[in-house]
A protein has these predicted regions:
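Residue-level recognition of beta-strand microenvironments
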Residues: 16-19, 67, 84-87
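Charged, alpha-helix-enriched surfaces in structured cytosolic catalytic cores
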Residues: 76, 90, 117
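Conserved hydrophobic positions within beta-strands
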Residues: 13, 64, 73, 78-81
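A short beta-strand motif that forms part of the nucleic acid-binding face
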Residues: 34, 68, 77
Length: 128
C-alpha cells in the first residue's frame, strides 16, 4: 500500500486529508497510516473521540485495539470533532484494508495544525 501524496502525516502515524496551510479553519478527515495499521495487526476495536469533543494536536484522543496490542490514538490537529466514522463500528477491518479511504476515523474543524510531514518525509522517516 502506498501513502497518499496529497495527505500530510504526523510522527505518531496519523494523517489529515489536506495540506497544513489549507487546514486551518476547515474540517479535515483523520485516520491512521497503513504503517500503523500493519504494525498493529488486525484491528478489533477503536475508541474514538465523540462529536463535540475538543482534540489537541499531539495529545491522545482515543485508542486502537488489535489482536497484538492497544495503542494510543493521537490527534494531528487541534479543534472540535464534527464527525466520527460510524461505518467502522463493528467493521474495524476497514482500518487495516483501506486506512486512507473507508477506514478514516474522525473529522475535525481545525483551529491549529500540529507538526506534519509530507508523504515523502513520512516515508523516509519510517522506512516505507
Amino acid at each position: 500500500m502506498e501513502l497518499k501524496q496529497d495527505f500530510y502525516y504526523s510522527e505518531d502515524h496519523e494523517w489529515i486529508n489536506t495540506t497544513p496551510d489549507e487546514a486551518a479553519g476547515k474540517t479535515v478527515r483523520v485516520g491512521i497510516t497503513h504503517v500503523a495499521a500493519d504494525r498493529l495487526g488486525e484491528v478489533v476495536f477503536a475508541e474514538l473521540p465523540q462529536v463535540g469533543d475538543t482534540v489537541t494536536a499531539g495529545e491522545t484522543c482515543g485508542e486502537i485495539e488489535s489482536t497484538k496490542s492497544v495503542s494510543d490514538l493521537y490527534s494531528p490537529v487541534t479543534g472540535t470533532v464534527t464527525a466520527v466514522n460510524e461505518d467502522i463500528d463493528g467493521a474495524y477491518e476497514a482500518i487495516n484494508n483501506d486506512p486512507y479511504g473507508e477506514g478514516w476515523l474522525f473529522e475535525v474543524e481545525v483551529e491549529e495544525v500540529g507538526p506534519l510531514m509530507t508523504a515523502d518525509e513520512y516515508a523516509s522517516s519510517n522506512g516505507v
